[in-house]
Each structure stands twice: as structure tokens, then as C-alpha cells.
Design a protein with these regions (language model features):
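SAM-dependent methyltransferase catalytic region
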Residues: 1-122
Length: 122
């Protein structure tokens, strides 16, 4: 699947807006403490171009500010089948504020540590 130039530009614009806020609000040491490494929009787009079927469900276990999930929606995934988990509540709030206007239910973006098997009972 190829994204249109309009979709690519929208993803880049969203990324630039939240990146400025995120870096202003979060120190380098805090990002290191949480192991935060954000996926650039260009990489999110390249990853999603590999999907031939947008009928499924997407789960990003370390969704950050939602770059990959926003790109998935713009690529044609159903927003109600997009899920994210984020350990940092401040970054989670950014993800929710970006994804809810795109149609993702707020309840689909969870606060939690998806890398810790003891965090969930499923």
C-alpha cells in the first residue's frame, strides 16, 4: 500500500507539532529513564507501506505519541481497531489528543508497561 503525498505531509506535520511540545516538556534524562525512542513519521510510513491488508487490528505496545498509529489510520486502518499502550502518562496524553480526533476511542490507548509480563492479566 502506498500513502499519498497528502497523507505523508499530514503525518509529518503532526509529528513536527507534537515533537516540539514533547521535547519542550521532557528532559533528556527523563526520556532515557523511560527508554523513550520515538519512531519518526518517515519510518512509520515505510513500515505501513508493507501492509497489503488494512482490515486487521493494530497494537503498538510502546506507542509513544502515536506516530505509528496515526500513520496506520491515514493508511486506511479502521480507527476503532487501533490500540496503543504507553508507560509515560504525559506522552500517553499526547497520543490520545492526536488519535481521538482521528477516530480512535480514548479507551483504546492505555497507560501501562507492555514490556513487563506482570503488568497485564491477559
Amino acid at each position: 500500500m502506498k500513502l499519498t503525498d497528502k497523507q505523508i505531509n499530514a503525518i509529518k506535520e503532526e509529528y513536527a507539532q507534537w515533537k516540539d511540545k514533547m521535547y519542550a516538556d521532557n528532559s533528556v534524562s527523563r526520556r532515557k529513564d523511560f527508554g523513550q525512542f520515538f519512531t519518526p513519521p518517515e519510518l512509520s510510513i515505510k513500515m505501513l507501506e508493507k501492509f497489503e491488508n488494512t482490515e486487521g487490528t493494530i497494537l503498538d505496545p510502546c506507542c509513544g505519541a502515536g506516530n505509528l498509529l496515526a500513520a496506520a489510520i491515514k493508511a486506511g486502518f479502521d480507527p476503532t481497531k487501533v490500540y496503543g499502550i504507553e508507560i509515560d502518562e504525559d506522552i500517553l496524553n499526547i497520543a490520545q489528543s492526536r488519535l481521538v480526533p482521528l477516530g480512535v476511542p480514548c479507551a483504546n490507548i492505555h497507560l501501562g508497561d507492555a514490556l513487563n509480563p506482570n503488568s497485564y492479566d491477559f
